[in-house]
Amino acid sequence: MRRFAMDKLLDWKKKSNRKPLILMGARQVGKTWLMKEFGKTYYEKTAYISFYNNQRMQAVFDTDFDIKRIIMNLNIESGVAITPENTLIVLDEIQNAPKALESLKYFCEEAPEYHVIAAGSLLGVALHEGISYPVGKVDLLDLYPFNFREFLCAMDEEGLESALETKDYNLIDNFSDKYLFWLKNYYYTGGMPAVVDAFRLNKDYAEVRQIQSDICLLYTSDAADE
């Protein structure tokens, strides 16, 4: 499924003054999928590391910020031979490894040739708990649920999406019935990727509601844990 944020990631990749990037966003908005898809599409290799229940990798960053040592550990953990020019390093669930978040400063200052993206669903909460943040040493990108144009693309309605981009209102008005139909479905699904994908495949409103309920329970659980 197409996410417009992919274009912003590509712009980041091409920047001459690129810094490590932190992908911000709530749970279930598709951060992990986007990072992996970006790596698969635009890099020869992706070294993916998740810090969720991964004490070994958390300990790697707790030791010190020697980038050469860190890269050697990432090589072994990911099973990927990391080379700066063609490897995307993905550090997922980074809120579970405060020192890994802090290490982005050293990637920026001492090893800017590496392409590093980090993400964490509860990162905003973690920062409020006093975790050190690499101010000025990272690029930021916010990811949200599907917007209406992305939803149209997911429903294989690229023609309708392209018409919106032209802002040709006579053309758009000519297909107002189609836009209203899909807008109602967009409002119903809400734009979360798992919901959109299920609706794309099955058009089952009961399934949509069940997935939405599961996501709400996850959010409630997160809130109760804080």
Question: Model regions: which residues?
Answer:
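Hydrophobic anchor at the beta1->P-loop junction of P-loop NTPases
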Residues: L23
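Short regulatory helix/loop adjacent to the ATP-binding pocket of P-loop NTPases
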Residues: V125-V138
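Pre-Walker A adenine-sensing motif
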Residues: R2-K15
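Short glycine-rich substrate-engagement loop in P-loop NTPases that contacts/grips substrate
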Residues: Q55-V80
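Conserved lysine of the Walker
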Residues: K31
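Interdomain hinge/linker elements that couple catalytic modules in large macromolecular machines
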Residues: C153-S221
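Structural recognition of the conserved hydrophobic beta-strand(s) that form the central parallel beta-sheet
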Residues: H115-G120
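Hydrophobic positions on the alpha1 helix immediately C-terminal to the Walker A/P-loop
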Residues: L34
